[in-house]
Amino acid sequence: MGRIFTVELEGRSYRCRFCRTHLALPDDLVSRSFHCRRGKAYLFNRSVNISMGPLEERLMLSGMHTVADIFCCCCGQNVGWKYESAHEKAQKYKEGKFVLERGRIVDEIDLSTEVYIDTHGSTSDTEDS
């Protein structure tokens, strides 16, 4: 595998929760009312720094769609899916758009309020007991 070049988005952005790679801009957000197996999901017009899995037919709550899972190009985590085609006329607006699972992305607000707790005990020799 060769060197990975990523796109750095200007301003506030949605990023991969696992490696903080930029994935989408708030200006490309279409809807926050989507759902996935793991909870909430957001629909975007565009997404960057992703790779796509194979196309597959998937039965969603809104009907049958042709979709491909999308993965962060840096860490390889599944972050959502892309709608390639919708079988029902009312769902055609989704074609070519990206769904990012809310639990797998963070935005600038999340980054500024995130708290990290070290759950592993220290193994320092100088630590007092």
Curated annotation (Swiss-Prot):
Pfam families: Yippee-Mis18 (PF03226)
Annotated Yippee domain residues: 12-109
GO molecular function: metal ion binding
Residue ranges of the TM segments: none
InterPro entries in the cross-refs: Yippee (IPR034751), Yippee/Mis18/Cereblon (IPR004910), Yippee_fam (IPR039058)
Binding residues annotated for Zn(2+), in chain numbering: 16, 19, 72, 75
Keywords tagged on the record: Metal-binding, Zinc
Highest taxon of source: Eukaryota
Family to which this protein belongs: Belongs to the yippee family.
Name this polypeptide is given: Protein yippee-like At5g53940
